[in-house]
Amino acid sequence: MLRKIKVTFIINDEEERTVEAPIGLSILEIAHSNDLDLEGACEGSLACATCHVMLEEEFYNKLKKPTEAEEDMLDLAFGLTDTSRLGCQIILTEELDGIKVRLPSATRNIKL
């Protein structure tokens, strides 16, 4: 049986939705499998910033540093914060049990 952890999505700064999610999947995959509005226009290929999310500092600090490619995409994200990451690049581990993921109120999809 796959080990699962709790992931709480914060929507529009008010609604919270907690789901159980299998370790090894990305935040983007979990959002999509739970019908949450996190776009992911490039389907996780690190070619857009539409899966931009904000994390609490505690969980942000548990992640590996963003790659240069992720940082380049984050520069295009709407409402960038110090704890912003791309949902497609956050892979769930046991250490992230209880993570809270804030969904932005808007995204910026730049078509190339």
UniProtKB/Swiss-Prot annotation:
Its cofactor is [2Fe-2S] cluster. Keywords: 2Fe-2S, Electron transport, Iron, Iron-sulfur, Metal-binding, Transport. This is 2Fe-2S ferredoxin. PROSITE patterns: 2FE2S_FER_2 (PS51085), ADX (PS00814). SUPFAM superfamilies: 2Fe-2S ferredoxin-like. Ferredoxin are iron-sulfur proteins that transfer electrons in a wide variety of metabolic reactions. It comes from Rickettsia prowazekii (strain Madrid E). Residues 5-107 form the 2Fe-2S ferredoxin-type domain. Binds 1 [2Fe-2S] cluster. GO terms for biological process: P450-containing electron transport chain. Pfam families: Fer2. The keyword Transport applies. The keyword Metal-binding applies. The lineage of its organism: Bacteria, Pseudomonadati, Pseudomonadota, Alphaproteobacteria, Rickettsiales. One of its GO terms (molecular function) is metal ion binding. Belongs to the adrenodoxin/putidaredoxin family. InterPro entries: 2Fe-2S_ferredoxin-like_sf, 2Fe-2S_ferredoxin-type, Adrenodoxin-like, Adrenodoxin_Fe-S_BS, Beta-grasp_dom_sf. [2Fe-2S] cluster binds at residues 42, 48, 51, 88.
